[in-house]
Regions:
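Axial heme c-ligation environment in periplasmic c-type cytochrome domains
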Residues: 61, 68, 90-132
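Periplasmic/extracellular electron-transfer cofactor-ligation site
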Residues: 38-65, 79-80, 88-104, 144-146
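Short, Lys/Arg-enriched N-terminal segments with co-localized hydrophobic residues
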Residues: 1-13
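Sec-dependent N-terminal signal peptides
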Residues: 17-27
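Electrostatic cytochrome c docking/interface patches
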Residues: 25-41, 71-79
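C-terminal partner/receptor-binding element of secreted or periplasmic proteins
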Residues: 131-145
Length: 146
């Protein structure tokens, strides 16, 4: 019922706040320059968003929507990088995007890839592997902000 929905929303908010806090700590420690995130970006995002994040990738002209640039996310958010929104957008498994949208649902793709490769074994679940890739990618996006 309503209480269950509220708990789910509260859980999502708490998870996003926790992730955002982890990102702030990682960014402050210099992890934002991690090459793993850059590699992930070049493989998963540059085709549409461009190698420099300006929204001018080789596939951008083939899409029926305008591909946004990613270098001014902080500037367009009052100088603060919108951690939770970026993570949720990349992940795509929460909310309306899970039912289809202009971006791939990377969280599901990453989790399936971890499961298929056998990389998610022991204490690392496919979901944890997916979130790690999303966090690396988010840290890279922080590093390219103007």
């Amino acid at each position: 019922g309503r209480l269950e929905g509220a708990r789910t929303t509260g859980d999502r908010m708490m998870r996003r706040a926790t992730i955002a806090g982890a990102l702030v700590a990682l960014a402050a420690s210099g992890a934002a320059a991690d090459p793993v995130g850059r590699t992930e970006y070049m493989v998963a995002c540059a085709g549409c968003h461009g190698e420099s994040g300006l929204g001018d990738g080789p596939l951008a002209g083939l899409l029926q929507i305008e591909t946004p640039g990613l270098t001014r996310l902080a500037a367009e958010n009052g100088g603060e990088f919108p951690y939770a929104d970026v993570i949720a957008t990349i992940d795509g498994r929460d909310g309306l995007r899970a039912h289809g949208g202009p971006m791939p649902i990377w969280g599901e793709r990453y989790a399936q890839a971890a499961l298929a490769s056998g990389a998610a074994e022991g204490t690392m679940t496919p979901d944890m592997m997916a979130r790690a890739r999303i966090l690396s990618l988010t840290l890279y996006l922080i590093s390219i902000q103007e």
